[in-house]
């Protein structure tokens, strides 16, 4: 036998490696298993004919084909109406009694993907809590009277005494440990700090569509058997089929919570009666759902909601009107990950997009056919100014009073822009300051987003080195709050110096300036 060439040896090595990989993945029998379960019989291949003559006597084969041992009712020609009755068992047992061919798992998956439609009571979706107890838990929030991180110590020495540094020397909440505060089941994608000041309420949503409500206990645990068994007061309910994108409260009624999702739906939750209403399902002209990436209530009209989508669309609608009409506008050809309204000029919005741009828009002016877009489906708005980033822009946020716009993205930077005066804005936006910051996440961590505090010119952002960093609008760092894991999704309390961050396992880190808490050990 002639010796193999180098090419042939390499080919044999590749074949062997691929076969080993298939064995490890257990894929060798998948195709035949699928055909078998579907009731499709693969015809046996006829052997290749030989040149020699064969004898005329042939073995007679059985005419009856071999039937699969497992077949669904559909393949047996039976109707679903033939079922005599439903067994008297609970839901979990009923799901486990599915057909023997594994269709019960598909049925369960279909149920999980079924969105909540219409108006519902949360108590109907939460079977392990009494309705009266739930109402009692949240009724205290039913009132409308709320009208470079890693080297912080060295930075602090260089900056000297900066106003606000002591103010944001916050303490980690320690009544319960962070690993005990599992507010959702999956990776947190949105958090919200309710504006109530007498009692803390933190709301979070995860990537599966579950929403968690945490009534924060401020009183220390006593050395008693009852308190040793105490757990964080958390209520969870599944309202969506995909990521919870944004959580907010209605400006005119803070007992009413607004929730949006990547599945295109917007829902409200009334804390006084735990009624959840369907506000809107955002769809295009083809009746396809448009995932909602971000939203914010208008400063000029608190009943009007501005929102952006995963496909680059933008619209506004009146939340008081059910089935409200809306007109879609195109602001990007790719996902808009973040949107913010300018508090000094409420007709201006900023967007950060996967197309690697930060853009400022004037929503008063319409552009019928935007030259920058490859689509011709919707009109757009007038572009005031643009900043081109090296990589995608993850977040945009305006300071409340001094005209600073912050953005961060996958290029590991935080950029600050002076947008106080419209007259000084050029078509090409230039940052007044760039801060190096470790904020590039991977697949298993939610995107880090800088957020200005609603009542102060300070912003916070999570750090991939497991911390929350706080800066003022001049770029001076005020605090570095260390955590055990990455608190990727942060939310400020709008009036108090409290901040919360959610991680990839559904847990919350809470920092406050309460005197009763004990500082985290260095």
Swiss-Prot record:
Query: Where, per the database record, does this protein carry Phosphothreonine?
Result: 69
Give the UniProt subcellular location, in the record's own words: Cytoplasm; Nucleus
Query: According to the UniProt entry, which residue ranges have a biased composition of type Polar residues?
Result: 54-63
Which SUPFAM superfamilies has this protein been placed in?
A: WD40 repeat-like
Assigned protein family: Belongs to the WD repeat DDB2/WDR76 family.
Q: What induces it?
A: Closely coexpressed with replication factor A (RF-A), the cohesion complex and the DNA polymerases alpha, delta and epsilon.
| Chief subcellular location | cytoplasm
**Which Pfam families does the record cross-reference, listed alphabetically?**
WD40
Protein task: DNA-binding protein that binds to both single- and double-stranded DNA. Binds preferentially to UV-damaged DNA in vitro. May be involved in DNA-metabolic processes.
Protein name per Swiss-Prot or TrEMBL: DNA damage-binding protein CMR1
Q: From start to end residue, where is composition biased (Basic and acidic residues)?
A: 75-84
Q: Phosphoserine (modified residue): where? A: 64, 224
Keyword presence, Nucleus: yes
- Kindly state one GO CC term assigned in the UniProt record: nucleus
Check the UniProt entry and state the signal peptide residues, or none.
none
């Amino acid at each position: 036998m002639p010796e193999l060439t180098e090419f042939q040896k390499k080919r044999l090595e590749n074949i062997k490696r691929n076969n080993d990989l298939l064995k490890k993945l257990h894929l060798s029998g998948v195709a035949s298993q699928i055909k078998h379960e579907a009731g499709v019989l693969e015809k046996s291949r006829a052997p290749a004919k030989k040149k020699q003559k064969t004898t005329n006597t042939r073995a007679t084969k059985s005419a009856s084909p071999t039937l699969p041992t497992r077949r669904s009712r559909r393949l047996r020609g039976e109707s679903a109406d033939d079922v005599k009755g439903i067994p008297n068992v609970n839901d979990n047992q009923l799901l486990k009694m599915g057909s023997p061919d594994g269709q019960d798992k598909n049925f369960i998956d279909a149920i999980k993907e079924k969105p909540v439609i219409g108006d519902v009571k949360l108590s109907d979706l939460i079977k392990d809590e009494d309705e009266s107890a739930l109402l009692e838990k949240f009724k205290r929030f039913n009132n409308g009277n709320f009208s470079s991180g890693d080297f912080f110590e060295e930075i602090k020495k260089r900056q000297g005494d900066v106003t606000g540094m002591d103010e944001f020397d916050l303490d980690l909440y320690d009544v319960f440990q962070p690993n005990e505060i599992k507010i959702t089941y999956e990776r947190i994608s949105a958090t919200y700090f309710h504006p109530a000041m007498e009692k803390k309420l933190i709301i979070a949503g995860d990537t599966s569509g579950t929403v968690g409500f945490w009534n924060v206990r401020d009183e220390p645990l006593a050395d008693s058997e009852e308190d040793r068994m105490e757990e964080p007061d958390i209520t969870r309910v599944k309202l969506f089929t995909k990521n919870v994108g944004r959580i907010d409260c209605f400006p005119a009624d803070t007992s009413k919570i607004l929730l949006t999702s990547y599945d295109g739906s917007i829902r409200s939750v009334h804390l006084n009666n735990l009624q959840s209403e369907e506000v809107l399902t955002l769809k295009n002209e083809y009746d396809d759902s448009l995932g909602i990436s971000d939203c914010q209530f208008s400063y000029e009209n608190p009943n009007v909601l501005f929102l952006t989508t995963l496909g680059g669309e933008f619209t506004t609608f009146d939340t008081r009107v059910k089935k409200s009409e809306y007109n879609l506008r195109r602001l990007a050809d790719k996902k808009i990950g973040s949107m913010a309204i300018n508090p000094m000029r409420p007709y201006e919005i900023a967007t950060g997009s996967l197309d690697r741009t930060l853009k400022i828009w004037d929503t008063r002016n319409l552009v019928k056919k935007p030259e920058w877009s490859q689509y011709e489906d919707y009109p757009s708005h007038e572009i005031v100014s643009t900043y081109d980033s090296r990589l995608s822009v993850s977040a945009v946020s305006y300071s409340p009073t001094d005209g600073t716009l912050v953005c961060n993205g996958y290029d590991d930077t935080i950029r600050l822009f002076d947008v106080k005066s419209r007259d000084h804005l050029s078509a090409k936006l230039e940052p007044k300051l760039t801060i190096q910051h470790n904020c590039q996440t991977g697949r298993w961590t939610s995107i880090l987003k800088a957020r200005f505090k609603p009542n102060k010119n300070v912003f916070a952002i999570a750090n991939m080195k497991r911390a929350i960093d706080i800066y003022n609008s001049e770029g001076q760092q005020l605090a570095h709050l260390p955590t055990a894991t990455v608190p990727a999704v942060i939310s400020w309390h709008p009036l108090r110096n409290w901040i919360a961050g959610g991680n990839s396992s559904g847990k919350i880190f809470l920092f406050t300036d309460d005197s009763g808490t004990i500082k985290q050990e260095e």
